[in-house]
From Swiss-Prot:
Keywords tagged on the record: Chemotaxis, Hydrolase
Gene: cheD
Recorded catalytic activity of this chain's protein: L-glutaminyl-[protein] + H2O = L-glutamyl-[protein] + NH4(+)
Enzyme class, first EC level, given as a word: hydrolase
UniProt-listed InterPro entries: CheD-like_sf, Chemorcpt_Glu_NH3ase_CheD, Cytotoxic_necrot_fac-like_cat
Functional note: Probably deamidates glutamine residues to glutamate on methyl-accepting chemotaxis receptors (MCPs), playing an important role in chemotaxis.
Protein name from the UniProt record: Probable chemoreceptor glutamine deamidase CheD
Protein family: Belongs to the CheD family.
This protein's record includes keyword Hydrolase: yes
Stretches assigned to coiled coil: none
Organism: Moorella thermoacetica (strain ATCC 39073 / JCM 9320)
KW Hydrolase (keyword) present: yes
Lineage: Bacteria, Bacillati, Bacillota, Clostridia, Moorellales
Length: 167
């Protein structure tokens, strides 16, 4: 009898990142205003997934959990991928999340739009690192789940009440 090998599935929690090689999938749940960043090296079929909460670490004294912040998590994820054999020049990015989960009549609260700021900082950091952003599913007012398939590089976006989307 032939053994069936099930690909590894690794969950990525809020303010965490993980790296994995194919075959396998990285999954993060509950992306509201948070942003999920999938980085992929197609030749090595390896990638990483980060689930960031905040755009910028500069306003915080406690930066002990670097995975919380877009500006630091992406740097650390890139370093981890390179440390495991990925080539920086081959990395591409796909992102999801950055939603406006709460609406308010208060103009001041609207200016705090953390989802939009998270997505903007992720784009800026990727651009500064010269990592092409090849696909995204951001904005709106709904949560998302990201499922990153390391075999194909596809990122599946699951949203309640919407069709499954592949980016």
């Amino acid at each position: 009898m032939e053994a069936i090998i099930k690909p590894q599935e690794v969950k990525v929690g809020i303010a965490e990142w993980q790296v994995l090689r194919a075959p396998g999938r990285l999954i993060t749940l509950g992306l509201g205003s948070c942003v999920g960043i999938a980085l992929y090296d197609s030749l090595n079929r390896m990638g990483g997934l980060a689930h960031i909460m905040l755009p910028d670490s500069s306003q915080f004294q406690d930066r002990s959990n670097r995975a919380k912040f877009a500006d630091l998590a992406i740097l650390d994820l890139v370093a981890a991928l390179i440390g495991r054999g990925a080539r920086r020049g081959r990395l591409v990015a796909k992102i999801a999340g950055g939603a406006q989960m709460f609406t308010s009549g208060d103009r001041h609260l609207s200016l705090l739009n953390i989802g939009q700021r998270n997505a903007a900082m992720v784009r800026q950091t990727l651009q500064e690192l010269a990592i092409p952003l090849v696909a995204e599913d951001t904005g709106g007012n709904y949560g998302r789940t990201m499922i990153f398939d390391l075999e194909s590089g596809d990122v599946l976006i699951r949203t309640i009440g919407r069709p499954l989307k592949v980016i």
